[in-house]
């Protein structure tokens, strides 16, 4: 088996003039992987390349694939992902993965940007202040999840109510309100963070529903899962597929009520 022409062209656009040493050390493996990832998978559906790479970066963050993430930053930019969009993906990951897992990715992103001649810091994307982040976060939750989120931040048992407060003012008020990505794109990268890290099926199902409410329908989410199988493998992909199917059923049941 040889590397297909489609795979070769796609790889060249990702990494111009780069010659992988795997062709010398692991020729059988790299032929199968490249033909699968960069021909069979990318040509399976009509997802645009920019969206594909946004999901790949978010998935690699969730999966903690630091070396592959670093390699994919220039590739993503070659397919239309802007530096500010890459930074927004990294920033939002903190709310879902924690700074302990995101810190190395932020450092690697800055290194790649420096190598690419991208001046830091990038233009500010913040739209909230300390004074209005709570109310802005609540409005964002309502916009994404529906009117049932009104007053969410002050509900629940007293001993844990502060966590809901933080979810509203920090996760949504600090991150989701930023410019650089749309609500639909922010829900999409959250879906990728959760699908890739695994073990958070209730949250993944909830955010699959939020994606569907914001224009990322069931088939689109299945396409996202499919496009990222080369990066996270089959077990977590199949778990994510189950969550998407469950979310679609729950959405249909709600529509029938």
Task: For every predicted segment, state its role.
Residues 61-62, 79, 92-99, 195-196, ...:
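A short structural micro-motif
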Residues 206-208, 214-228:
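Extended hydrophobic/aromatic segments used for targeting, binding, or gating
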């Amino acid at each position: 088996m040889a590397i297909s022409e489609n795979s070769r062209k796609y790889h060249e656009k990702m990494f111009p003039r780069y010659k992988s040493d795997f062709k010398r050390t692991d020729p059988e493996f790299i032929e199968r992987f490249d033909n699968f990832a960069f021909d069979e998978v990318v040509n399976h559906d009509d997802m645009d390349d920019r969206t594909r790479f946004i999901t790949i970066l978010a998935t690699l963050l969730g999966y903690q694939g630091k070396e592959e993430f670093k390699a994919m930053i220039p590739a993503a930019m070659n397919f239309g992902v802007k530096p500010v969009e890459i930074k927004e993906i990294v920033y939002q990951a903190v709310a879902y993965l924690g700074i302990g897992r995101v810190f190395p990715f932020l450092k690697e992103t800055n290194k790649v940007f420096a190598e690419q001649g991208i001046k830091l810091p990038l233009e500010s994307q913040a739209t909230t202040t300390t004074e209005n982040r709570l109310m802005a976060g609540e409005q964002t939750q309502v916009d994404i999840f529906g009117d049932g989120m009104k007053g969410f931040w002050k509900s629940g048992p007293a001993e844990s109510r502060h966590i809901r407060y933080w979810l509203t003012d920090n996760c949504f008020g600090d991150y989701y309100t930023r410019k650089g990505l749309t609500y639909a794109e922010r829900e999409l990268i959250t879906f990728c963070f959760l699908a890739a890290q695994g073990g958070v099926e209730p949250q993944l199902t909830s955010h699959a529903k939020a994606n569907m409410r914001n224009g990322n329908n069931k088939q689109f989410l299945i396409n996202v899962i499919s496009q990222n199988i080369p990066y996270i493998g089959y077990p977590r992909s199949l778990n994510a597929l189950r969550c998407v199917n469950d979310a679609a059923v729950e959405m249909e049941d709600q529509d029938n009520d």
